[in-house]
Amino acid sequence: QWSGRATLKNYFSVGIWSNYRPMGINDFFEPRVDGRVFKQDASYHAMTWMSTDYRKTLAFDLKGSYGRGNGQRYSYELGPRVRVNHKAVFRYKFKFDLDANEKGYVTDYHPQEDSIIFGNRNKETYTNTVGGSYVFDNKTWITLNVRHYWSKVDYDQFYNLKENGRLEQHENYSGNEDFNFNVFNVDLMYSWNFAPGSFLNVVWKNSIYESQTIENNTFNNFFENFQDTMNSNAVENSFSIKVSYYLDYKYLFKNSG
């Protein structure tokens, strides 16, 4: 594994990262059964990114990556940000991930026979995030993030996971495992730095979930999918207050002595 980054005189930053696993990996999580393993072959992953000058009113982040091992993985991100003034910043980020011909767990077909079904799948994931922050003063600020996560998975072949961790084609399994999954999140947080190293955070979170099995490979388009998500009854809300207080033991011991 290696990485590098550089920042130019105009505050334009670039970076690169790469990872290579020549021996492959033993994945003990993907089978979902204690004592079983899924052996994956050698893999590599490379990523590059760039960022323009954040001091300017308009700035951009761009990232792209490619990986090969358990299938092929393509990913890219685009994130413009607008700095209104020294108090307010707004951000948008779009991320797309494609896992092509990835092998992964599907179900325990015959759990009494320790038969574990894997599938060959294409998984597309779209994430849109809009956020912003506003600083009231040097001790208090508020942040808001709104995110829509959409993942759709299409299976075209099924396998049996053998005891040696390898896959063999399964001729009899014919279940429909194609699915569509969405999450819509709203996160609002107020922060107060009431003492050095000490914070009060008040957080409200709202989440909407939508999941469905897809028949005959008939996935909805983005707008139909988003509308189904907003009409879902699977809604969660949470409210939390967290206080973190920094204690300087040297200061306490000094005063007590």
Where do the PLM segments sit?
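Exposed, low-structure sequence patches enriched in small/polar residues
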Residues: 1-257
